Amino acid sequence: MRVTAQLIDATTGYHLWSERYDRPLKDIFALQDEIVQKIVATLKLQLTLWEQGDLVRKRTNNLEAYDYFLRGSEQFLRLTKETHAQARQMFERAVELDPQYAEAYQALGYTYLREWMFQWSPTLQNLERAFELEQQALVLDPSLPFAHVLLGWVHLWKDRQYEQAIAEAERAIALDSNNADSYMALAEILTYLGRSEEAIGWMEKAMRLNPRYPALYLRILGTAYYWTGRTEEAITVFERALARNPNWLAAHLFLAFVYSEVGREAEAKAEVAEVLRLSPAFSLEGVRQRLPLKDPADLERFLDGLREAGLK
């Protein structure tokens, strides 16, 4: 295996450090640690003992389990029911190969949560299973920020435990203040609570931390824009999300609602058709059961918009 690593100042284009490594494939994790330590030394960073430990933590020593985790992650991001099922199988295989692999449990739990959110499964057992798997991930590695994020989402979607959901997102931020996903999660929770102005601030911070943010970030930002009266900006952001990933069901759903609100009926119906393409059993009653908007008036408004757009 040959790796050429470069560290470049993004603001100036200046090469801070570059090195080539030739190693046997079995040494991939040791090589990863070595590269990280070289970057830290080059940047002259002063790390706490906790941060040093986090940098060299090995998620797994099983290369095959790691391969299944990466392959599962790729399928998970494709956002179709079929690729989602493939992702779950790969995460399950990663756990079988390494029962101590915390990140694999975390990812496996996410598959159960998303299956519920996208109405690919009608059963609440999915949320129970997601909760169990995220807890297992945190037993194995309490410092995983995104496992706390997912646990917070389960609290939100399963029991409407808004304060507990916020607490989990804040715990994730405390564990790693540079983890963009933690701020994204906090922003989403706040939009459901009717605190969208705050949510916009957190989403902007998340996007600064991760300039290559996924479509999910845009969907949450668009939602916050809508609830603060910035309707045209919301539409633009939802459209950008779908340009990045045309299979993002939630972006189609929210865009259908906003199009309906502004009288763009044909476009609203087209977005509902996309939702049904991705999840044929998707229904208004399913949205009512799932969407954790705290204000009942907001939920009814959302449902009315989708009904006008043709969702049944």
Regions found by a protein language model. Give the residues of each.
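Terminal, low-structured helical/coil segments at or just beyond the last alpha-helical repeat
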Residues: A281-K312
